[in-house]
Amino acid sequence: MRPETAIIEIHGQYRIHTEFYGNPAAQQTIILVNGSLSTTASFAQTVKYLQPHYNVVLYDQPYAGQSKPHNENHTPISKECEARILLELIERFRAEVVMSFSWGGVATLLALAQRPGRIRRAVVNSFSPQLNPAMLDYLHRGLDYLAACDRTQIGNLVNETIGRYLPQLFKRYNFRHVSSLDEHEYHQMHFHIREVLRLNADSYTESFAGIEIPMLFMNGELDIYTTPHEARQFGQLIRGAEFHTIRNAGHFIDVEHKAAWQQTQDALLAFLRPQRTQPLNPIYRPQPNGASVPLAALAS
């Protein structure tokens, strides 16, 4: 099913490309927040199991994907700004659920800390409150390559680290995507990494402790960058936190293989629809089409 697309102006400053996958029978709308260099295409597999149950909203950040031509992109934007964009889109689409992937979790949690009245539940995938040695090494290497605008090294870094468990087909498209971005996108990622490195435990405690809605944190068993164990530290900050580990999966969980995709679908729907009837089961079928292949990001 093709989505309805639109360019939405936010705060008179940003123009955001959105995709709306409508379901006439759905009673709720879920908005998905991708990573820093990812686009709406990164959620191609996720939409397959969500759209039979929900209205689904995807969007590109102002500096990325199909939003990029509609914005000047002279100055990097902060995660706080991304959180404000998300809050506005939640209102525009009347979303009740938000779900993020990897570093999209920062903007999502910052937005949830504002206690948006519409949101009833949230899911955060492949994210942790702790920057462990593996993640720090990845980020510092990324800073060097981004500062030099070394496209080949940036593409290789993603595939060799957080993307190590992706199928080869996805790795090829991943490399093509990450190594062919505009320079302002690399500058944006460099800015975001520096933001992330300045975060500390106190910042998380102060910002996120007020979140009171039920939340599910999902991480891959094999992910050494945002580990399931470290993600559980959110339980000390967020009262309604639940946790689920996707077996035999790395950072990109549901796009890595069929079993991980099914586990992610089952855990997500069990959390969002605890009284649901037997869900529809779409088919996991990686697409050999660049437009629909999930794309990684340097810090996703």
Curated annotation (Swiss-Prot):
Entry annotated with the keyword Transferase: yes
Keywords, comma-separated and alphabetical: Transferase
InterPro entries assigned: AB_hydrolase_1, AB_hydrolase_fold, Carboxylesterase_BioH
GO molecular function: pimelyl-[acyl-carrier protein] methyl ester esterase activity; transferase activity
Pfam families documented for this protein: Abhydrolase_1
The keyword Membrane appears for this protein: no
GO biological process: biotin biosynthetic process
EC id: 2.4.1.-
AB hydrolase-1 domain boundaries: 29-253
Pathway of action: Polyester biosynthesis; polyhydroxyalkanoate biosynthesis
Function: Catalyzes the transfer of the acyl moiety from in vitro synthesized 3-hydroxydecanoyl-CoA to acyl carrier protein.
PANTHER family recorded: HYDROLASE ALPHA/BETA FOLD FAMILY (PTHR43194), PIMELOYL-[ACYL-CARRIER PROTEIN] METHYL ESTER ESTERASE (PTHR43194:SF5)
Name of this protein: (R)-3-hydroxydecanoyl-ACP:CoA transacylase
Source organism per UniProt: Pseudomonas aeruginosa (strain ATCC 15692 / DSM 22644 / CIP 104116 / JCM 14847 / LMG 12228 / 1C / PRS 101 / PAO1)
